[in-house]
Amino acid sequence: MSPVKVFGHPMLTNVARVLLFLEEVGAEYELVPMDFVAGEHKRPQHVQLNPFAKMPGFQDGDLVLFESRAIAKYILRKYGGTAGLDLLGENSGIEELAMVDVWTEVEAQQYYPAISPVVFECIIIPFIIPGGGAAPNQTVVDESLERLRGVLGIYEARLEKSRYLAGDSITFADLNHIPFTFYFMTTPYAKVFDDYPKVKAWWEMLMARPAVQRVCKHMPTEFKLGAQY
């Protein structure tokens, strides 16, 4: 049995992030599925793994971690060298490492807050509200799209200068965008990316990666209560 266990549902963005980096480095792992609709993540045994009662929980031997971005960094530091990957830029020099850090922060502090409300309003809230069919709050969507366009404009300028966000090699900063952007691209607003050709080409390169495809096949493009995900 693999010493690495991921507790959660693969359709959830933060679980998908952890699975993505495990797939990138080729690490052996066990996914322990959890039914979030039934509230399994709130049960005492899971709270021991994640005190905030969120998913994922992560266990590697005696080590227990939570927070998906932190887990992903741990995975890369433990297994990335064996896989011949330097996605954190730690072996590339201090300037390269700094650029990875900058764009990792941009994803978490600028991109995620802009794109996630659209995903929540269009996909997640209608899915979790009893009875389904809840209409998105269009004011929230419109304000978020305006903010997202501003962020994408900055990305477009950056990607005119380099193949990826932190330079000409793919890094942790790029791959962190996968989970929420994947779901955003299933909303009626996916065409926003068409106005930013460099960004769209970058996104298509990310989606072409085998590890990304393996993880995204477990992320549904339609959500229905009672469906088996």
Curated annotation (Swiss-Prot):
PROSITE patterns: GST_CTER, GST_NTER. Changing residue 171 to S: In strain: cv. Fidel. Signal peptide: none annotated. Pfam families: GST_C, GST_N. It comes from the Eukaryota. SUPFAM superfamilies: GST C-terminal domain-like, Thioredoxin-like. Glutathione binds at residues 41-42, 54-55, 67-68. One of its GO terms (molecular function) is glutathione binding. It comes from Triticum aestivum. It is an enzyme of class 2 (transferase). This is Glutathione S-transferase 1. Its EC number is 2.5.1.18. Keywords: Transferase. InterPro entries: Glutathione-S-Trfase_C-like, Glutathione-S-Trfase_C_sf, Glutathione_S-Trfase, Glutathione_S-Trfase_N, GST_C, GST_Phi_C, Thioredoxin-like_sf. Residues 2-83 form the GST N-terminal domain.
